[in-house]
Swiss-Prot record:
Function (record text): Catalyzes the NADPH-dependent reduction of 7-cyano-7-deazaguanine (preQ0) to 7-aminomethyl-7-deazaguanine (preQ1).
Binding partners and assembly: Homodimer.
Reactions the enzyme catalyzes: 7-aminomethyl-7-carbaguanine + 2 NADP(+) = 7-cyano-7-deazaguanine + 2 NADPH + 3 H(+)
Main location: cytoplasm
Protein name in the entry: NADPH-dependent 7-cyano-7-deazaguanine reductase
Organism: Delftia acidovorans (strain DSM 14801 / SPH-1)
């Protein structure tokens, strides 16, 4: 089983510019899920990790460089996630590789990533890969997460490691439906300790969640070392168990690093995924 410490994170890496799917480094989701009480395949949430790649390039058959953006949709049911530096190195391996067209690039991306994401599992599946060519760059929008801004609150913050005890909900009053947003989410890379900056949107129905406590809780991730996907699942599970909403979704959009941004979405009820639209900070 791969571990984060075995990855290329924090290490000097050779940049390979010929197609090399072996660069992908999958990490099992299970160990971190067990920490938050999620065991086996019976998960209390649905969702996906929405990735955007801003630095994809390859050569056409005449050697002329091609560039594109890519949106990836990785189901949260995959037993593995992809360590982000290995994802970057893998994408760089297309740089001097001659390929017929974007469709061939898309097919290789889908095949290679699906193999790594389901590696070691009897279950196999696919992922979403959408290549955005130059002719559609002007259709890529910038849009902020909608919802009531928690950051307006003047709260004292003293805890900088996850503190779920800050979460409270009023079960004595009628249930509500709310969408709350904060741009103050910060955590650190699990291996390198480098800062990860994000915005988070929380939609729920149920007993009204105390907003000051929720903001303080989100701020408490500030010195916490964990990957993006793991932070969002921890936030989901803490709210789900402490506040006991009827429905809940947690969606975070993290600023890009190495030409990639990662935007995990987890929800208690199956439904449509949010649009993968970047925010101003991304």
């Amino acid at each position: 089983m791969n571990t984060p410490e075995q990855s290329q994170l924090g290490k000097s890496s050779a940049y390979i510019d010929q197609y090399a799917p072996s660069l992908l480094f999958p990490l099992p989701r299970a160990p971190k899920r067990e920490e938050i009480g999620v065991q086996g395949s019976q998960m209390p949430f649905f969702g996906a990790d929405l990735w955007t790649a801003f630095e994809l390039s390859w050569l056409n058959l005449r050697g002329k460089p091609q560039v594109a953006l890519v949106h990836f949709t990785i189901p949260c049911e995959t037993p593995n996630l992809i360590e982000s530096k290995s994802f970057k190195l893998y994408l760089n391996s297309f740089n001097n590789t001659r390929l017929a067209d974007a469709a061939e690039v898309q097919a290789r991306l889908r095949t290679d990533l699906a193999e790594a994401l389901w590696r070691g599992s009897e279950q196999k599946g696919s992922i979403g890969v959408k290549i955005i060519g130059l002719d559609r760059f002007d259709q890529e929008m910038v849009q902020e997460l909608d919802g009531l801004l928690l950051d307006r609150l003047d709260v004292e913050c003293t805890q900088y490691q996850p503190a779920p005890e800050l979460l409270h909900a009023n079960h004595e009053e009628a249930p509500v439906t709310e969408t709350l947003v904060s741009h103050l989410l910060k955590s650190n890379c699990l291996v390198t300790g480098q800062p990860d900056w994000g915005s988070v949107q929380i939609r729920y129905s149920g007993a009204q969640i105390d907003q000051e406590g929720l903001l303080q809780y989100l701020v408490s991730f500030r010195n916490h070392n964990e990957f993006h996907e793991q932070c969002v699942e921890r936030i989901f599970m803490d709210i789900w168990t402490r506040c006991r909403p009827l429905k809940l979704s947690v969606y975070a959009r993290y600023t890009r690093r190495g030409g990639l941004d990662i935007n995990p979405f987890r929800t208690s009820h199956p439904g449509a995924l949010p649009a993968n639209v970047r925010s101003a900070r991304q």
